[in-house]
């Protein structure tokens, strides 16, 4: 990716007769136009909020972590866009500072959007704003996770919030980038009074424990999360040639902790799945 590559394209009738139109990128960044051309390298995350709003997370380089939104019915490159987050102070209701590199993950519940940031150590934070109310770069934002806030993960340790999934007022975050960083954290009452607990990572990988972080098979990051009913599925990745990419599952209606409730369902040839590569 290079500067100017961050674009959003829309496909209509994509299941039968696909037609594509560019709806974001290469604007001026002002007066309703999308973000400026020749500036942003990557659209790192996308989500539809409440069925009506397209939310786009940008970034790769320092200061590029911005959140833009547009009504799904009226997005074009030059109309309908609003910058909602980024380039602020990170305090007093303002969004994150202009040193943050990337919005790696997005999740929503109703009109509330959760934003996962980061590239470098200490940037792995989660922010919340209600798009149904006031949500601008300088108002409406609350940091809910990271920097030990609300009993969350340590400051200056984790690089990215790789993945997010929300169910009602509960949010799950997948962290990581470097050895032993692949963890899943759960936030309860995340829309009002957030409280975090670690539910995956740093286990032994056997007897119901979550994935291990032993020498030679240390998991780097939780690249993906999906929630189907009460089943939380986790995509955990390690260095090429060690454990590779694995899929794990836990029933969140029961006990899910780092050492209880987990089952590996794919990877390392398990259940006729893929092997270890690299």
Say what each PLM segment does.
Residues 1-42, 49, 62-102, 108, ...:
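Trp- and S/T/G-rich repeat-edge/linker motifs of beta-rich repeat architectures
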């Amino acid at each position: 990716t290079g500067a100017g590559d961050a674009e959003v394209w829309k496909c209509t009738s994509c299941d039968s007769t696909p037609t594509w139109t560019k709806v974001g990128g290469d604007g001026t960044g002002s007066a309703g136009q999308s973000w400026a051309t020749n500036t942003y390298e990557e659209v790192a995350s996308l989500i539809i909020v409440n069925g009506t709003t397209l939310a786009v997370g940008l970034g790769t380089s320092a200061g590029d972590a911005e959140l833009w939104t547009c009504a799904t019915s009226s997005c074009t490159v030059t109309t309908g866009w609003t910058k909602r987050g980024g380039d602020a102070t990170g305090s007093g209701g303002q969004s994150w500072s202009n040193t943050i590199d990337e919005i790696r993950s997005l999740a929503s519940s109703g009109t509330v959007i959760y934003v996962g940031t980061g590239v470098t150590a200490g940037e792995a934070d989660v922010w919340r704003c209600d798009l149904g109310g006031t949500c601008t770069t300088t108002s409406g934002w609350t940091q809910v996770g990271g920097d030990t806030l609300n009993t969350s993960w340590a400051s200056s340790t984790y690089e990215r919030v790789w993945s997010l999934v929300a169910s009602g007022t509960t949010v799950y975050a997948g962290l990581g980038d470097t050895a032993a960083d692949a963890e899943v954290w759960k936030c309860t009452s995340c829309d009002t009074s957030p409280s975090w607990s670690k539910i995956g990572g740093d286990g032994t990988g056997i007897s119901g424990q979550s994935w291990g972080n032993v020498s030679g098979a240390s998991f780097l990051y939780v690249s993906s999360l999906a929630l189907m009913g009460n089943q939380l599925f986790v995509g955990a990745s390690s260095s090429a040639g060690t454990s590779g990419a694995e899929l794990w599952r836990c029933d969140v209606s029961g006990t899910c902790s780092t050492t209880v409730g987990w089952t590996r369902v794919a990877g390392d040839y398990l259940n006729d799945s893929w092997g270890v590569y690299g």
